[in-house]
Amino acid sequence: MAETKVNFSDKLDEMERIKAHSDYLRGSIVQGLADRVTGAIAEEDTKLLKFHGSYMQDDRDIRDERRRQKLEPAYSFMIRVRAPGGASTAEQWIAMDDIANTYANGTIKLTTRQAFQFHGILKRNLKQTMKDINQSLLDTLAACGDVNRNVMCNPNPYQSDVHSEINQIASAISRHLSPKTQAYHEIWLDGEKVLDTSDEEPEPIYGKTYLPRKFKIGIAVPPSNDIDVYSQDIGLIAILENEQLVGFNVAVGGGMGMKHGNTATYPQVGRLIGYIPKEEVVDVCEKILTVQRDYGNREERTNARFKYTVDRLGVDWIRNEINNRLGWQLENKRPYHFEHNGDRYGWTEGSGKWHYTLFVQNGRVKDTEDYKLKTALRTIAEVHTGDFRLTPNQNLVIANVAAHKKNEIEKIITDFGITDGQHYTGLRRNSMACVAFPTCGLAMAESERYLPSLITKIEDLLDEAGLKEEEITIRMTGCPNGCARPALAEVAFIGKGPGKYNMYLGGGFIGDRLNKIYKENIGEAEILESLRPILLQYAKERTEGEHFGDFVVRAGIVEEVRDGQTFHS
């Protein structure tokens, strides 16, 4: 049983009351779905719906016009489909494509946590969409909410035996930490209520109030830090001996979100607390999660993430508490080395099969007049006998291609003009953006719809400086919640208002260092005006192999930030 140390008092955040009285995430969601008078559901149910993998949203492009017409907002729902390690079969890809066409806005969003995301689903179609997702043997449970989210890892298990083992471990962690309530099956899959929750505890790990906030786990396999291991609540770094996986270094308390104007909130990098044998990894993840369950801040959600718990109680205290719960001591961390946190594009061979990583700008799979990416991928899925793997950088691996199928798939790629991104600049290949407008209710500025055009203008500056092939990470979010992990980028833009961004510089190319604010509340003209002299200086003064983020720190353009507690200082 989950023995939470939650003391219900008037000081607790309202969300804690909602969870406690939700009957294990049921609330009145069923009744809300049946109400045809409105396209919305009750406010409290929107908070519970997140645990089921969905957010209620509205079209912000037409919000003002609908208000003038005295109409309710154009409500719709986003659904996020979890896929541990980004794994999906060709059949599942076809199912996702069908769902996008039938119920959503005709596009698929590949997220920065290796999940599928659909936008524009109307309330009347929400249940059937959930059913169709589950019929494909994927699901949405715990894709959002105050629980462990989609577990990340290198997307290609066929790269080596170690990568295959890592994928299996990611799936095992995901299964073990999934909520056990039957509410999901009752609401979406017409399952019967299988137990009386008034007498029995159906959540042996989480308890009635689940976690104080969302919780994220990722596994990195050096030298690739593609999952941004230091951004995770639990970051696991694979340790190999003689090309065999033996265990993991464990980092705790990473996280990207903050709030503008509130210096008590900040991004943070995970802190290494030791090494564990691979056989213990699922249990260790559970024990760390329960520390956050019991000691996380349930009074103020803005300070409820595990990073704040670690900073408040101290790394040593956290390590000792984990040791006590395990009944054994974490070992000393072991050596490892990261070289990059991006994807490797094009064809590669591994485990006797071929794999093609293609560039998907900001993770949006759609057809345009000039670029039929969605149709091309559907065509590939209809002949492909392997997998589709979602990367942590919003790209896609057509994986496990049999040798006799390679030419056929290569012809489809060529016929549709699909690109692996090799002809793009290093900046564009290393870019990420969140959804932002028009569907995200938190967005303060554009992101996905704007970053590509801004990059085009920055590319002119790179060309002038002779840096067009330089690998530089650039990320943009429409708000400071950090969905595209902007605080780790060498160049980052975080929305402050319409057309205005805070600009940050100096993140580590391998994702190990936070960036620092350089300019506040600036528009495009000032962004370009600010970047030009820095890029020219970088081209002239950099040392051999020196990355842009390292240079701006060394040159004193921004201060180095290794601890989020100094992010605002």
From Swiss-Prot:
<comment type="similarity">
    <text>Belongs to the nitrite and sulfite reductase 4Fe-4S domain family.</text>
</comment>
<dbReference type="GO" id="GO:0019344">
    <property type="term" value="P:cysteine biosynthetic process"/>
</dbReference>
<dbReference type="GO" id="GO:0070814">
    <property type="term" value="P:hydrogen sulfide biosynthetic process"/>
</dbReference>
<dbReference type="Pfam" id="PF01077">
    <property type="entry name" value="NIR_SIR"/>
</dbReference>
<dbReference type="InterPro" id="IPR045854">
    <property type="entry name" value="NO2/SO3_Rdtase_4Fe4S_sf"/>
</dbReference>
<keyword id="KW-0349">Heme</keyword>
<dbReference type="InterPro" id="IPR036136">
    <property type="entry name" value="Nit/Sulf_reduc_fer-like_dom_sf"/>
</dbReference>
<dbReference type="InterPro" id="IPR005117">
    <property type="entry name" value="NiRdtase/SiRdtase_haem-b_fer"/>
</dbReference>
<dbReference type="GO" id="GO:0000103">
    <property type="term" value="P:sulfate assimilation"/>
</dbReference>
<dbReference type="InterPro" id="IPR006067">
    <property type="entry name" value="NO2/SO3_Rdtase_4Fe4S_dom"/>
</dbReference>
<keyword id="KW-0004">4Fe-4S</keyword>
<keyword id="KW-0479">Metal-binding</keyword>
<keyword id="KW-0198">Cysteine biosynthesis</keyword>
<keyword id="KW-0521">NADP</keyword>
<keyword id="KW-0408">Iron</keyword>
<feature type="binding site">
    <location>
        <position position="440"/>
    </location>
    <ligand>
        <name>[4Fe-4S] cluster</name>
    </ligand>
</feature>
<dbReference type="InterPro" id="IPR006066">
    <property type="entry name" value="NO2/SO3_Rdtase_FeS/sirohaem_BS"/>
</dbReference>
<dbReference type="GO" id="GO:0050311">
    <property type="term" value="F:sulfite reductase (ferredoxin) activity"/>
</dbReference>
<protein>
    <recommendedName>
        <fullName>Sulfite reductase [NADPH] hemoprotein beta-component</fullName>
        <ecNumber>1.8.1.2</ecNumber>
    </recommendedName>
</protein>
<dbReference type="GO" id="GO:0004783">
    <property type="term" value="F:sulfite reductase (NADPH) activity"/>
</dbReference>
<comment type="function">
    <text>Component of the sulfite reductase complex that catalyzes the 6-electron reduction of sulfite to sulfide. This is one of several activities required for the biosynthesis of L-cysteine from sulfate.</text>
</comment>
<dbReference type="InterPro" id="IPR011786">
    <property type="entry name" value="CysI"/>
</dbReference>
<keyword id="KW-0411">Iron-sulfur</keyword>
<feature type="binding site" description="axial binding residue">
    <location>
        <position position="483"/>
    </location>
    <ligand>
        <name>siroheme</name>
    </ligand>
</feature>
<dbReference type="Pfam" id="PF03460">
    <property type="entry name" value="NIR_SIR_ferr"/>
</dbReference>
<comment type="subunit">
    <text>Alpha(8)-beta(8). The alpha component is a flavoprotein, the beta component is a hemoprotein.</text>
</comment>
<feature type="binding site">
    <location>
        <position position="483"/>
    </location>
    <ligand>
        <name>[4Fe-4S] cluster</name>
    </ligand>
</feature>
<keyword id="KW-0028">Amino-acid biosynthesis</keyword>
<dbReference type="GO" id="GO:0009337">
    <property type="term" value="C:sulfite reductase complex (NADPH)"/>
</dbReference>
<feature type="binding site">
    <location>
        <position position="479"/>
    </location>
    <ligand>
        <name>[4Fe-4S] cluster</name>
    </ligand>
</feature>
<feature type="binding site">
    <location>
        <position position="434"/>
    </location>
    <ligand>
        <name>[4Fe-4S] cluster</name>
    </ligand>
</feature>
<comment type="pathway">
    <text>Sulfur metabolism; hydrogen sulfide biosynthesis; hydrogen sulfide from sulfite (NADPH route): step 1/1.</text>
</comment>
<keyword id="KW-0560">Oxidoreductase</keyword>
<dbReference type="InterPro" id="IPR045169">
    <property type="entry name" value="NO2/SO3_Rdtase_4Fe4S_prot"/>
</dbReference>
<dbReference type="GO" id="GO:0020037">
    <property type="term" value="F:heme binding"/>
</dbReference>
<dbReference type="GO" id="GO:0046872">
    <property type="term" value="F:metal ion binding"/>
</dbReference>
<dbReference type="GO" id="GO:0050661">
    <property type="term" value="F:NADP binding"/>
</dbReference>
<dbReference type="GO" id="GO:0051539">
    <property type="term" value="F:4 iron, 4 sulfur cluster binding"/>
</dbReference>
